[in-house]
């Protein structure tokens, strides 16, 4: 909140830091109200992913980052209190039959356990007029955790735990090694944001350096 509020967090479509922060705090408040301690994440949009991670962390929870939608990973995700996603694929994989709407007017999966919060239009509900005031404490706890699961493509899948402090330290180390400054470079990723490299480059490095994110994965 202390950084330039009209700078872009993401492109295509554009998302300013002011609107991004409002979305983080709005979702954080909703997670606190629902007493969510752990959220499983599956996103195509890197900016919505970043918003969800920060919201869970700000609310005092931890995130489980699914490497793909294979059955064993969905079972791992079911150990969380809620799924957060922008993907219709997740809902279909979980086998939901009935759709209701949450307070954002978005589809809410009421049959799966845990529930699925489908958040592709969250930014549309975070205008200054509709958003609650920013909380007094907007800091992310250093000990906030992200649990990443490797795909298992090179052996048995493993769970790696990263803290917010570790991710920031990694991002600062990378920033010192890369020949770029803070001149508005855009981060484009060829892996999903839930991937270990995606989490480092598309999330931590982009936010630490203030570089806008290209929302969609660049598949090649």
Please place each PLM-identified region on the residue numbering.
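Conserved AMP-binding A3 loop
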Residues: 14-17, 137, 143-172
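Conserved AMP-binding/adenylate-forming core of the ANL superfamily
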Residues: 2-33, 45-46, 162-165
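ATP-dependent adenylate-forming carboxylate-activation enzymes
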Residues: 44, 64-77, 211-220
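Intrinsically disordered, low-complexity terminal tails and inter-domain linkers enriched
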Residues: 91-118, 122-133
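Conserved pre-ATP/AMP-binding loop-to-beta segment of ANL
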Residues: 1-4, 116, 120-149, 180-187
């Amino acid at each position: 909140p202390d950084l330039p509020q009209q700078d872009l967090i993401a492109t295509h479509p554009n998302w300013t830091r002011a609107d991004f922060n409002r979305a983080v705090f709005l979702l954080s408040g909703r997670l606190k109200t629902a007493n969510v301690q752990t959220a499983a994440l599956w996103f195509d949009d890197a900016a919505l992913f970043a918003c969800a991670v920060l919201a869970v962390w700000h609310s005092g929870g931890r995130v489980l980052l699914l490497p793909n939608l294979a059955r064993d990973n969905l079972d791992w995700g079911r150990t969380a209190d809620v799924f957060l996603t922008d993907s219709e694929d997740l809902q279909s994989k979980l086998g939901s039959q009935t759709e209701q709407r949450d307070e954002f007017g978005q589809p809410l999966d009421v049959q799966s356990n845990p529930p699925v919060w489908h958040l592709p239009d969250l930014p549309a509900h975070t205008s200054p007029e509709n958003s609650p005031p920013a909380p007094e404490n907007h800091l992310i706890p250093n000990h906030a955790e992200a649990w990443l699961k490797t795909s298992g493509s090179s052996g048995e899948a493993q769970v790696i735990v990263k803290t917010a402090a570790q991710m920031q330290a990694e991002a600062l180390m990378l920033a010192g090694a890369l020949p770029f400054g803070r001149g508005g470079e855009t981060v484009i990723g060829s892996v999903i944001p839930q991937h270990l490299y995606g989490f480092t480059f598309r999330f931590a490095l982009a936010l630490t350096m203030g570089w806008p994110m290209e929302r969609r994965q660049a598949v090649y």
